Structure formats: C-alpha cells, structure tokens
C-alpha cells in the first residue's frame, strides 16, 4: 500500500518539532502535502498517516467493514509512565478485548443517563462561582466541571478529605503532564532521570506516587465495605468478572481509572469550551 507524501526530515527531528509546536507542525504539513500526509514520530515508532479532511475521517471511523484500519496498543506505549502498563489503550489482542469487555457495562446508555443529574448539579455549582459582569476563563471552569464529574461518577468520591486530596493531587499531576518537557519524558526515556524531588522527572514521579497512594487506599476501603448499591464506575469495575471468572486486580483498576481520567478530563473540557 502506497502512503501519502510527507516531510523527509529525520524522525527524531519530526518528533521534536511536533512536541515543540504541534499545531504549527501539523498545519505546515497540511499546507505543503495536502489533507493527508505521512509522518515519522521517532526512530522506533511506525509511520503514521495523518488525516485532516473530515470526510476521510468519517470513512475511517464508520465505513471500515473490512477492518483495514487498526489501532494497536503498542502505539500508545508512550503513555505508560502516566497511565500504567495495564491501561486498555496500551493493550492489544486478547488482553485488549478482555479489558474492553470488563469496562463496557459501566458505560451502557441507561447507566450513563443516570449520571445526568449529577453532572447538571456540578455544572450549576461551578458556574455559580462566576461573577456576572466579570471576565473569567471558560476553559478553567470546564476543567473543574470535568474533574469533579470524574471524581464523583468515576471514582465515587463524596465531598470530604479524600475528595479534596484527590482533587489537589490530580490537578497537580495533570498540570505537570501538560508541559512540553513532560511530553518529552514520554517520548524520550533517556530524559527520565530521577535526581530528587526538585528535578523535573523526580517531581513527576512524586506526584504520581501521591495519586497512586490515594487510589489504592480507596480501592482497599471499597473491598472492605463491599457496598453493591453504589453505581459509580469504580464499584462497577470492581464487581466485573471476565469469562474465566477473574476480577480486575488493584493494579488494573488503578490503570483504568487513570485512563478514564486522562481520556475524560482535558479532552472533554476542551470540547465543551469550543462548543460554548
């Protein structure tokens, strides 16, 4: 299969350009090579074909009956430092299918509709904090809404000490993960040098460990309580079993919670901001 043309610069240089200014890099490629082009993001990564035409994306997402297009988990291995080695987006084959099967029940239509009132209440709570006639940053409000929805609907936390600790810890880690340097950590393992809590990577590791302690404490507490009346995603994941009767381990639960956080926080906040 022939691939669209694209930049001929060394793969590592393409990756650096993308990390430094992704919008500029993609825009320049689109203007030079058209609606589809091929890039190389790093020496060990496969070629990636980028599509910027909405009609092409629609065909890929809705008309791929022959399953020509695939998204193997290996392409997402760069997110392992944040999401963990057992995240569903980093798995392939049978392991991926098993995890998807276990994660599907909490996201059935009726279950999702039951979260509507909670989402509306959180939205009202956050927006009431905005002063009429005074400027505010909309994206910040959307980030707060999505994070609190995740804490309540996914993690199942109620207002209290652990809720506040988790909110602070997640904001701290997500802020640290959104810098260009942190993206460099994901793609260039040689940069992951833990030189103490004040070093960039050391600070990231410390914040991740803080999150992990809070998550594992919450999981341990839930296993002790065994409250089957709760309808948050964590409770439903803990009660799920695969075809062999195996439940998710604590490590798998942690990684999937972090995956849901990463997938539902920044992306949803950005989409809501653009929509408004």
Predicted regions and their residues:
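Active-site catalytic pocket residues across diverse enzymes, especially alpha/beta-hydrolases
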Residues: 64-65, 241, 276
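N-terminal membrane-proximal hinge/A-helix region immediately C-terminal to the signal-anchor transmembrane segment
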Residues: 1-85, 89-98, 113, 117-125, ...
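Short hydrophobic alpha-helical segments that form membrane-spanning helices or hydrophobic packing faces
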Residues: 60-61, 268-276
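Generic hydrophobic alpha-helical segments
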Residues: 26, 219, 257, 275-276
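Cytochrome P450 heme-thiolate monooxygenase catalytic core
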Residues: 1-3, 68-79, 95, 111-270
């Amino acid at each position: 299969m022939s691939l669209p043309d694209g930049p001929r610069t060394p793969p590592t240089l393409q990756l650096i350009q993308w990390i430094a200014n992704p919008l500029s890099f993609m825009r320049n490629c689109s203007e030079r090579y058209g609606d589809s082009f091929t890039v190389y993001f790093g020496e060990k990564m496969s070629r990636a074909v980028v599509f910027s035409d909405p009609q092409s994306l629609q065909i890929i997402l809705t008309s791929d009956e022959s399953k020509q297009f695939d998204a193997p988990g290996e392409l997402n291995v760069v997110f392992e430092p944040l999401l963990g080695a057992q995240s569903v987006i980093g798995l392939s084959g049978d392991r991926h299918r098993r995890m998807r099967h276990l994660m599907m029940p909490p996201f059935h239509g009726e279950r999702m509709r039951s979260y509507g009132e909670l989402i509306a209440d959180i939205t009202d709570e956050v927006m009431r904090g905005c002063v009429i006639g005074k400027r505010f940053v909309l994206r910040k409000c959307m980030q707060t809404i999505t994070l609190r929805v995740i804490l309540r609907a996914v993690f199942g936390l109620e207002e209290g000490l652990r809720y506040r600790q988790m909110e602070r810890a997640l904001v701290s880690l997500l802020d640290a993960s959104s810098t260009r340097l942190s993206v460099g950590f994901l793609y260039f393992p040689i940069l992951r040098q833990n030189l103490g809590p004040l070093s960039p990577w050391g600070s990231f590791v410390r914040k991740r460990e803080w999150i992990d302690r809070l998550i594992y404490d919450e999981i341990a507490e839930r296993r002790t309580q065994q409250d089957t009346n709760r309808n948050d995603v964590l409770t439903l994941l803990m009660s799920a079993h695969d075809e062999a009767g195996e439940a998710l381990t604590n490590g798998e639960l942690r990684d999937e919670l972090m995956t849901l956080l990463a997938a539902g926080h920044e992306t949803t906040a950005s989409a809501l901001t653009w929509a408004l």
